[in-house]
A protein has these predicted regions:
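Short N-terminal helix/helix-N-cap motif within the alpha/beta-hydrolase-1
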Residues: 50-60, 78-81, 150, 224, ...
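Alpha/beta-hydrolase fold catalytic core
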Residues: 1-42, 63-66, 101, 105-106, ...
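Conserved alpha/beta-hydrolase catalytic His-Asp/Glu region
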Residues: 150, 172-234
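Active-site loop/oxyanion-hole signature of alpha/beta-hydrolase fold enzymes
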Residues: 13, 24, 32, 70-112, ...
Length: 299
């Protein structure tokens, strides 16, 4: 996200100024909603431990043809970060559905990444039972731990999930964060220092670093609800696409292989051979091109 080379660059503070805080299920949630209401709508769901700002590199390109709605989920970005809250994927899905209802969305596309993929799986399961809010037109999943058996968590993530988690929070500084975060990017698409500083700043808004050990419980959720969430992918009546950075050590090519083994619905697949865990940040032009091709195929 180089501000010098990209005229469409949006800084985190500019991003904040373009959105607003909305009260959803009793929590103050940051929402950015741009584009004419007559355009097709995309709801964008971000990953851990970052925020809706992850979508900034492809925002301008998408906004030419779509109304875009992104939120910082509870505990992330500019949204509330309650310390004692019991965070869960189901709870985040409830907030997303509250947003869908507040915006009075009848039908829309979903574009998700990482933690957002898991939220999307729960929402997709609700769609399949007729209990979901609104009607999905499609769902596109970027790199994420769709299957707990193929999710190769970083050591830091495993420690955060342990009883040592809350103590590790206190010891994690910018240097440790930048090293771990950069490790999941592709070898030729590492984040710039400016990007790392921005991601770290967003994490620390509202003292967010200190709830990492509460947010990381989504890894347990994935195991507990595996059957429901994998079944949602297998039985989906909604077109599904996967755009995957293949060299992602957490959920790269090995995750795609498992996706195929389990015969999950797959209407479109793009494998980016030298890209890591954050395709929309590392290769925004390619992600936009593939996503638009997927949508075009639906017509």
């Amino acid at each position: 996200m180089d501000s010098n080379d990209n005229p469409d660059y949006i800084s985190p503070k500019q991003w904040q100024s373009r959105g607003e805080l909305e009260i959803l299920l009793g929590h103050s949630i940051f929402v950015i909603d741009e584009g004419a209401t007559h355009l097709p709508t995309i709801v964008l769901l971000h990953g851990f431990p970052t925020s809706s700002w992850d979508w900034a590199p492809i925002w301008h390109s998408l906004s030419q043809s779509y109304r875009l709605i992104a939120l910082d989920m509870l505990g992330f970005g500019f949204s509330d970060k309650p310390n004692s809250h019991r965070y869960s994927i189901h709870g985040q899905a409830d907030i997303v559905e509250a947003l869908v209802k507040t915006k009075r969305l009848d039908d829309f596309h979903v574009l998700a990444h990482d933690y957002g993929d898991t939220v999307a799986q729960e929402l997709l399961a609700r769609q399949l039972t007729g209990a979901g809010a609104g009607t999905w037109l499609s769902c596109c999943l970027l790199n994420g731990g769709l299957f707990p058996e193929t999710h190769r968590a970083l050591l830091t993530q495993k420690l955060l999930l342990s009883p040592l988690g809350k103590f590790l929070n206190r010891l994690t500084g910018y240097s440790k964060f930048s090293k771990n975060f950069s490790s999941v990017f592709g070898p030729q698409s590492k984040p710039l220092e400016q990007d790392l500083e921005n991601f770290w700043w967003l994490i620390n808004v509202n003292n967010g670093k200190h709830i990492f050990h509460n947010l990381i419980t989504y890894m347990r959720d994935r195991i507990e609800h595996r059957e429901r969430w994998v079944s949602a992918l297998q039985k989906s009546t909604i077109p599904l696409a996967v755009i995957n950075g293949s060299v992602d050590p957490v959920s790269g090519a090995h995750m795609v292989a498992r996706y195929k083994e389990l015969h999950c619905r797959l209407d479109y697949l793009a494998q980016l051979s030298v890209i890591g865990h954050y395709p929309q940040v590392e290769a925004p032009k390619e992600v936009y091109s593939h996503y638009q091709h997927f949508i075009d195929l639906l017509d």
